[in-house]
Regions:
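Short alpha-helix in the alpha/beta-hydrolase fold that links the catalytic acid
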Residues: 153-163
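Conserved alpha/beta-hydrolase
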Residues: 50-69
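Primarily recognizes the serine-hydrolase "nucleophile elbow" in alpha/beta-hydrolase
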Residues: 86-138
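N-terminal cap/lid segment of alpha/beta-hydrolase-fold proteins
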Residues: 1-23
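The serine-hydrolase catalytic nucleophile loop
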Residues: 36-47, 156
Length: 229
């Protein structure tokens, strides 16, 4: 039976609502965020592919884009994302985060308290050509992808990759395509993303589920568990 997405909303700062679609599977949550001036459709079929592979995909519009509230503002991407990750994490546990372009580069500087368990940057594009300050988040596993046929974009992606902590993996393919188009042109990369999520996100999600279940059991009184005849 195919999985169909449903509309979803996440409230961030000052009651502002980010809207998009969610694939309601029982798997680990993965948040997708498009780049500036794009929309939900920019991901092509990545959201559906990940959902088919068992992940609860949450594909959201940025502030001021598409269905979301507010005015588009590049300066709020970091704070909005920190707020939405906090909301999602409180409900669904450890999170995977996937972005591309300028947004992917910006999100490498998320506050450690709101950091995802897995972060995937597809062709991240920082606004500078200078080395970036290091991002030390030992609890986050990073996957950075780039098409090496575009030398400039590959160098930019490398700047981001080099700024990250030790738990990271670089994946590249000989292609001029970048961002979601890179995945569309080389679909085996979606398989690589899936394997990375299964390796680093799924175990954390299962541990979270077990802890939550153990807590429910410990809080259940004998009277709660008594079966009435």
């Amino acid at each position: 039976m195919s999985i169909e997405p449903v509309s979803t909303e996440v409230i961030v700062g000052d009651g502002l609502i980010l809207r998009g679609y969610e694939w309601p599977t029982r798997g680990a949550p993965v948040v997708l965020l498009h780049d500036h001036d794009d929309d939900l459709d920019a991901w092509h079929d990545l959201d559906g592919e990940l959902a088919t592979n068992g992940f609860r995909v949450i594909n959201l519009e940025l502030r001021g884009h598409g269905l979301s509230d507010g005015e588009a503002d590049r300066n709020t991407v970091l704070s909005d994302t920190e707020a939405l990750l906090k909301e999602v994490k409180n409900v669904w546990g450890p999170i995977g985060l996937c972005a591309y372009g300028d947004v992917a580069a910006t999100l490498c500087f998320l506050d450690s308290l709101c950091a995802p368990t897995v972060q995937i940057g597809i062709s991240p594009q920082p606004s500078t050509d200078k080395p970036l300050d290091g991002t030390q988040r030992p609890d986050t596993a990073y996957l950075v992808m780039s098409g090496t046929g575009d030398k400039k974009r590959t160098e930019q992606a490398r700047l981001v990759f080099d700024s990250l902590g030790r738990n990271k993996l670089w994946a590249s393919v000989a292609s001029k395509q970048q961002g979601p188009e890179l995945l569309q042109k080389h679909p085996h990369l979606i398989g690589d993303i899936t394997l990375f999520l299964q390796r680093y996100l799924v175990p954390a999600h299962l541990d979270w589920q077990k802890t939550a279940l153990d807590q429910v059991i410990s809080e259940t009184t004998p009277q709660d568990s008594k079966i009435k005849k």
